[in-house]
Amino acid sequence: MIGLADCNNFYCSCERVFRPDLVGKPVVVLSNNDGCIIARSEEAKALGYKMGDPFYQVKEKLEAEGVAIFSSNYTLYGSLSNRVMSMLSHYSPHIDQYSIDESFFEVDYSMAKSFFETDHSMAERFFKEYPKENVTSATADSLLHQYGARISADVLQAVGLPISIGIAETKTLAKIGSKFAKKYKGYQGCCLIDTDERRRKALSLFPVEDVWGIGRQIARKLDYMGIRTAAQFADKKESWVRSHFNITTVRTWKELNGESCISIEELPQKKSICTSRSFADEGITDKNVIEEAVANFAVRCTEKLRRQGSVCQGITVFAWTSRFNESVPEYTIHDSLTLPIATNAQDEIVGAALTILRARYPKPMADSRPDRPGMSFNFKKAGVILWQISPDNPRQQDLFDPIDRSKQKALMEAIDAINRKNGYGTIRQAIQGTDCQFDLKREYMSKRFTTNINEILKVKTQ
């Protein structure tokens, strides 16, 4: 069986962990530069706020209705995500993190039975008083449900984040189960789809456009064909599905019918890695600051690259001015290069990114100030994309490579270890700067309670 643990309204729930006064109250989280709404609590959804609502359009309404507003605090979210994933690893030997707030895991009856017999839940390590289930006579299905419900309760107790768990024969069905567990409290945090009867009932109640793997275009095509529920799609013959859709959709159809086509390890590596940012206010006009920003984006990309055990050979850099401000000239930078040898070393990738940027950066305009060359262009967004990604081991070697790759790899591992322990940017390249002049506009950001000693939560006692 495959389980999926999905954190409920993750960003909003993270903000509530250190603000218990917000439990039961509407909360929204904003995108980079406080641009639009990207996360909503259930209470905020009930008030009618939508994903992507521009903040400037709903700001007054949010304030009038007493909605708690937060800027994105990715440091906090990443830290709490790591805690959840660490806890999940104690309940299953095979964990496959799908996103910051979702993770697949393997589960079976013997695993659940062994867990309850030893009764070694993570929550009990931190809390002396914790209810113990009597499962000596539990059937296989009820035991699996209790196991999932226990994981959900333990994570809430120890980390403070509510999670919903779906358990089924396939990843796609587990996804559907987690949606039901999130929507209906009667499931106690876990929905088990382990029989054909339960599968068919779940699919009959689930919109086909919400099925994992069914995109908007395919959903529109299915709707045109009169297929609105997952059950209607699953009931079609395989030959019909193959004649109308691609192999990916056929795999989704098989998964809905209980045939596992996506194993725990099979989720593909990213074909490209991108780090980009929109700049606040009027943008950036200083070439040195743009270079600093691009260097930081390149470093972030290399960290992601090393984290998934990959190397890349292609690099793209882009930057552009505002398309909506007619008072300043428009300019776009977008160029790529291919490295002779695939790498994940940040010094090589940062150097290549800066080479692209400097080659395409606009020359000073005739009417620009002599002491601030190139200041007539206000760049509103920039980013770095890594492509031609392949596994780090094995990697294609070059007989005449002047770099000692073993020493380079050891250096990158040391830098990553130090930065993980002491915080991002503890060791950085000089070109990255120290004052983040290109930093995001985050007027509503909460503190980094779990990673910054100066922002740790203080509790007053009498």
Descriptions of predicted regions:
Residues 174, 325-329, 392-394:
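Short acidic/His/Gly/Ser-rich catalytic and metal-binding motifs that mark active-site loops
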Residues 1-257, 264, 405-462:
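Gly/Gly-Pro- and Ser/Thr-rich, intrinsically disordered tail segments characteristic of DNA damage-repair
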Residues 98-102, 168-171, 310-314, 377-381:
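Short Gly/Ser/Thr- and Asp/Glu-enriched loop/turn motifs at secondary-structure junctions
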Residues 40-42, 329-335, 395-400:
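Short acidic, glycine/proline-rich loop/turn micro-motifs
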Residues 338-462:
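Acidic, metal-coordinating catalytic segment for phosphate/diphosphate chemistry
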Residues 210, 218-367, 371-376:
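DNA-contacting surface of Y-family translesion DNA polymerases
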Residues 10, 33-36, 322-325, 389-392:
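Short, charged/polar surface micro-motifs in flexible loops or helix N-caps
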Residues 162-164, 316, 381-383:
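Residues at or immediately flanking beta-strands
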